[in-house]
């Protein structure tokens, strides 16, 4: 299942349980950060109180991934495991470990993978195909210029503000391509 970052909050609000695997990926850092925050918050609301973060690289020891999933805290029965792949490539060890991991979900464990979207070659790799097949994918792509005024209006509404269409258009011209700057300006 694939969602875009803009529809994630509504989707999570309707879920009584989270899927075992989530993948937040794309090229828009702000949307990736906010999507991961939404997933963390919803997991906490649903009782996933044990949280562990792994940052894995191509040279990492990938055996820690299944070990981390298997080790739930003594006083917890649900775990939120966050796996960050900053390079977007798992390397040779991860190429093997990742598909094996997503084939066997661990009961009571939700795993969130965050990474930039791989290039076209990476998207053909078996590890990527296995991850996309097993996970609920949250696509975090840049907001197109045509949708930017609407995106800004939504941000302003959430902040208790309004603006006329021409103001939103001018605002969009100023921040085009930089959603973080747009978020900061709306927050002022």
Feature locations, PLM:
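Conserved beta/loop motifs at nucleotide-recognition and modification sites
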Residues: 1-188
